[in-house]
Structure formats: C-alpha cells, structure tokens
Design a protein with these regions (language model features):
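N-terminal glycine-rich cofactor-binding segment
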Residues: 5-22, 39-67, 82-83, 96-112
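Glycine-rich beta-strand-centered segment in the early N-terminal region that forms part
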Residues: 22-35, 48-93, 132-139
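Residue-level marker of beta-strand positions
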Residues: 27, 60, 79-80, 94, ...
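NAD(P)H dinucleotide-binding glycine-rich loop of Rossmann-like/cofactor-binding domains
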Residues: 89-174
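Mid-domain Rossmann-like dinucleotide-binding core that forms the NAD(H)/NADP(H) cofactor-binding site
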Residues: 137-222, 226, 280
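Glycine-rich cofactor phosphate-binding loops and adjacent beta1-alpha1 units
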Residues: 163-164, 206-287, 326
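C-terminal hydrophobic helical "lid"/dimerization subdomain
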Residues: 252, 256, 273, 298-345
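Rossmann-fold dehydrogenase core element
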Residues: 263, 275-314
Length: 345
C-alpha cells in the first residue's frame, strides 16, 4: 500500500509499505477515505520536535472498516467511521473521567500512520465513531466536515468546553488557524452571544465571520488588548478565552483580555512556560490540554455536521491526493493553506 513517510525535516515521501494486519485485541483495519495534515505535524516537519526517520505519519482520518479482531463487538467490517487521534481504552481512570487523550493504557507510538491507503486502529470498540451510511452517500464538502471530527473540530470544541462557555457569553478566540476557527464554531454551539476573533489575515477573518465570529480584532499586542476590552461591558474583559496558539505570549494576552473570574480554555500546544501570576490576581481559571473529546461530544458534533448546522470542512483550503502528500505539508508550512486535505479514495 502507499503511505506518507517522514524522511527528515522538510521531507515527506510517499512509499510502498506493508499493509497493516490484525495482530492483537480490539483492533480494526481501516481503508482510509480522507486524511489531513495537522498544525502539530509541522513541529517535526520543521525540525522543532524530533521524529524518527522513516516513520509513518498522520493522525486524522475517516474511512471504512475492512476487518476487525475477533473480540470487537461494536464495530464491524463495512462501517464508515471517524478515526480520532485519541486512543482511549474507555475504562481507565483518565478515560472514565473524560480524558481519553491522556489514556493510561495508550500504547507508545500508536498515534500515526493515518496518511495511508490503510491503517490499523486500536481500541476499535471504544475509539471509533460510526458515521451513518457509506462515503458515497456524502458530498465532498460533507466528507471534509466529517474529516474535521477526527481532530481539529473536536479540539476547537474542547477549548470551548474547557472555557466553560455559557449562553449569552462574550468570548475571545486567540488564533486564526484551523483550531481557532473551529473554536469559533464551538463557542457558537455552546451559545456565545459575542465572539471576538483575534486574526491578522483577511481570508481567515472572513472564514471566522462565516463560522460565527461577530467581531474581528486585527491589531497586535497592547492595541489588540485595548480593542478587545472596548468590545466588552464596562471594558471589563471577556467571559471566556479560547487560546489556540500555544505561545507564552498568547496565554499572557488571554489573561489581559479576560474579566475577573473568567476561564481560559487552552488547546494551543505549549511553546514555552507562560507567566501565570496575573491569572492568580484576577481569579482567572486556566484549563485545557490534549483534546479529550468524549464519544458523546463526538456524536454531538457528528449530528451538527449531518444536520448542516456546522460546516467546519471549510478550514480545508487546499486538497491533494496521497501521491502529493509532500505538497500538502509544504502548503501549510508556507501558509498557502489554512489546512490541507488528503483525498485517498
């Protein structure tokens, strides 16, 4: 089968590799229909994080189950499924408390190899989410939105839930990448009345407005803080902040624009240790981490996509076939795409 392989920073190749086989319990072999490049993939693509050479890559996909191990009871061959990037066992302390992204039984190295014609996933029963029907029942636009549920839309929703957004809240979203834009959708789903997107790029700001942002703040630094505060009641700050960047400065900025007692939902992969003293003095809560979107959340998002309530697939501004996976990475690295979609069927 064909699969995208990491060779060295800045170098992705599509190679012929062995098709995965069932070799344990609670496993499924999946024919991949759509995959995508995640912003976190750029860390090792750019050489910021280490990755072993010749590793199979990718952690976002939807596809059709081809085979399952004998013990699997909830999933069967022929099922169309979301293949999430988390691998929760469903029964450890972390999973039972809703943190499947921190599953205590996750196998090292199990998160990868989704950018391929076939992949193996475990635990099949607790992790895979069924999509009604078959891929042929959906338009390309719908398939793109379904693909976001494997990570980016789920991560944006995780930020919104962690920020404890309530109906009528004023919310700020820091970061106009795919996660931040999906955070806008998440905030709207939870009932936010005013959604302020901090964005320096016209195309991303326009998409943010389409997703539900009511205000765009294009300034940076202190000017951005002042503009956000001016959009809030009595200049007191927002009720919730979605931090979708990860830079220490983003957390600092979140603390500056949050009102007393607000909550920051943090999903940006950390770049450095932020200063947290201002959060203490303002009684601001800071929650978040690896998206641990539970099955009920995934099913809520799936229903929203199937009902046409949300269309997060619009974050995919470039599409590529698997043979051009290297171009998909380059497009995101060079900011020529908000997010790259791989069409594999």
């Amino acid at each position: 089968m064909k699969a995208a392989v990491f060779i060295a920073p800045g170098q992705i190749e599509v190679q012929e590799t062995a098709k995965p086989e069932i070799d344990g319990e609670n496993q499924a072999i999946i024919r991949v229909v759509r995959a995508s490049v995640c912003g976190s993939d750029l860390w090792w693509y750019r050489g910021i994080a280490k990755r072993e050479a010749n590793a199979l890559v990718g952690h976002e996909a939807i596809g059709v189950v081809e085979q399952v191990s004998a013990d699997v009871s909830q999933i069967k061959a022929g099922d169309f499924v979301i293949v999430p990037f988390t691998h929760g066992c469903g029964h450890c302390v972390a999973c039972l408390n809703g943190f499947e992204g921190n599953c205590l039984n996750q196998k090292p190295g199990s998160n990868g190899g989704y950018q391929a014609e076939f992949m193996k996933y475990e635990p099949a029963d607790s992790g895979l989410v069924k999509i009604p029907g078959a891929p042929a029942d959906y338009t390309d636009e719908q398939l793109a939105s379904l693909q976001t549920l494997s990570d980016v839309m789920a991560t944006g929703f995780h930020a919104a839930k962690n920020a404890e957004i309530k109906p009528g809240d004023t919310v700020a979203v820091i970061g106009d990448g795919a996660v931040g834009l999906c955070g806008v959708i998440g905030a709207k789903l939870l009932g936010a009345e005013k959604i302020i997107l901090l964005s320096h790029h016209e195309d991303r700001a326009a998409l943010g407005r389409e997703f539900g942002a009511t205000d765009i703040v294009a300034q940076k630094g202190a000017a951005a803080v002042q503009q956000v505060l001016a959009l809030t009641k009595e200049n007191a700050g927002v009720d919730a902040v979605l931090e979708c960047v990860g830079a220490a400065g983003a957390i600092d900025q979140a603390g500056q624009i949050a009102r007393l007692g607000a909550v920051i939902g943090r999903v940006g992969v950390p770049h450095a240790e932020p200063k947290s003293n201002q959060l203490f003095w303002k009684n601001i809560g800071l929650r978040g981490g690896i998206a641990s979107v539970t099955k009920p959340d995934k099913e809520l998002l799936l229903k929203a996509v199937l009902d046409g309530e949300i269309n997060p697939g619009k974050v995919f501004t470039r599409s590529f076939d698997l043979d051009h996976a290297a171009d998909a990475y380059a497009a995101m690295d060079q900011r020529q795409a908000i997010k790259s979609l791989l069409v594999i069927d």
